[in-house]
Amino acid sequence: MLGVCYYPEHWPRERWSEDARRMRELGLAYVRVGEFAWALLEPEPGRLDWAWLDEAVAVLAQAGLKVVLGTPTATPPKWLVDRYPEILPVDREGRRRRFGGRRHYCFSSPVYHEETRRIVTLLGERYGKHPAVAGFQTDNEYGCHGTVRCYCERCQDAFRKWLEERYGSIDVLNEAWGTVFWSQRYRTFQEVELPNLTVAEANPSHLLDYYRFASEQVRRYNRLQVEILRAHAPGKFVTHNFMGFFTDLNPFPLGEDLDFASWDSYPLGFTDLMPLPEEEKLRYARTGHPDVAAFHHDLYRAVGRGRFWVMEQQPGPVNWAPHNPNPAPGMVRLWTWEALANGAEVVSYFRWRQVPFAQEQMHAGLHRPDYAPDAAFFEVQRVVEELGALSLPPPGQAPVALVYDPEAPWVYEVQPHGAEWNYLALVFLFYSVARRLGLDVDIVPPGAALQGYRLVLVPSLPIVREKALNAFREADGIVLFGPRSGSKNENFHIPQGLPPGPLQALLPLKVVRVESLPPGLREEVEGPWGRFSSGLWREWVETDLSPLLRFADGLGALFRAGRYLYLAAWPSPELLGALLVGLAQEGGLSPKPLPSGLRLRWRGHLVFAFNYGPEEVVLPVPSGVRFRLGGPRLSPYEVAVWEEG
């Protein structure tokens, strides 16, 4: 099903009925409203104005549309900030942020918690049983604009309480943090400050705990809203719209409190911000990298425990990236179909109409500011027609699992040990190489059940907890661990028995030395799959295992013990591709290298093909297959669907 984000408060009331009618005629089903409207709902303290929202919901309902109502807490009004200036967050440099944008509040503010409780309760009481309201979105894009981590006095107080609950005694904290180093020892929890503005780098254990605390504060705040909505809106769903390539927040605990996850898909903006080779950025500037959207579909499907929406789908040029090109013709349709192929229940476009004023006036919509349909409108029309002729079976489990660790970016941000070390880049490399081989991938958190997967990819898992170790033990497929796995314990220490720490129960080896390399310095790696290169990171390993790959100096780069493998370097795409081909074949899969812009996705008995490239491609299908969409020759930016077997 399809939907759209709509801001009735931006347009004359006499326009609302026409907009709603056209939404329904287009074939849309859901409309998100209200997530930035606090100042209109409560223009003065305690004076509520529901009339405009009542009317907007009624107009949409009359057209047969279902409403997703956003709680308006991402934008506290000016009067609230003036009354309680302490709700404003403080940045890492100790500067208090000001009113005038959005997300201008601290997650630890008791006052803001109470104001949130009040406005969300009022919203739930008024609309929780409204027949046209299908569900609620809490807030909007938690953490956007660097707002997960605040450094105000309330955060300091809350962090001290969090530490006391976690450690129990200050002596335990001192031991866990290694405060004997640099004379950092604390006598009480009240002496612990936030880990910013230090002269030299802060203690890494201190930093990691603060990042954990800050993420948990977001969950605590979100849970406050969810519990209110559950009480006042029985039977209505509750979701939140997460972001792409955003690592300050661990989304999995939040997902446990939601009915399903949502995320905001902007493939062109994300591609422009990614650390990609320049030629790749240019090749995919108008389409997005072929794996950017799919990666997040798979991630947030896992966060939503099998269910997710795309709450905001890019419809044209955005306004916030360094460069904002126009999507190639057909890409809005392709992105929509790709989301559905990956299991999205709803794809909702942002926004119905481009707004002619304020911060997002250069962000395209399905309509131009002069009310005329924009290019994406006609692509959505085509999707609606195609959806009417194609029944989508339930998604199934992929043959490959990729373990994504939300704490790993924090660990490597605290102590990267190499300027180019980037956890997301390594994870994306593993994901993308697997997809280039025509393999479907499920993203799972550490500790998730791994039964049924033929191949499990663990690009890097710095902290290996018992639950994750047990899941690896119980996996019935081949498991490949990447560099720096098991390199730290829970407290950010090097494991007593050296890395890979607990993984030594599966792989009898020790990492005794590591190095980070500048981008131009490469290491040759050779083995049964050929000669390749690695870079950025290398490890020295002590073991009685015979290496499957060796560096040029003869030392091992890849080791295997039974179903488990350990890769002691950051691989090139060619090296990783050759390795995954061999492991996938051993696992009973049939990897097939695809043309550079082509990607496949299975949904039940249907196979979807997406051509992100500027060249026509011939699809890898046997003769006689039944195509439900397209055909065996796929033009640039086109979609094909066929039935398998």
From Swiss-Prot:
Pfam entry (one): Glyco_hydro_42
Matching InterPro entries: Beta_galactosidase_C, Beta_galactosidase_Trimer, Class_I_gatase-like, Glyco_hydro_42, Glyco_hydro_42_N, Glyco_hydro_b, Glycoside_hydrolase_SF
Residues binding substrate, per UniProt: 102, 140, 320, 360-363
GO CC term (a single one): beta-galactosidase complex
EC number: 3.2.1.23
Reaction equation(s) it catalyzes: Hydrolysis of terminal non-reducing beta-D-galactose residues in beta-D-galactosides
Active site: residue positions: 141 (proton donor), 312 (nucleophile)
Binding annotation for Zn(2+): 106, 150, 152, 155
Record-given protein name: Beta-galactosidase BgaT
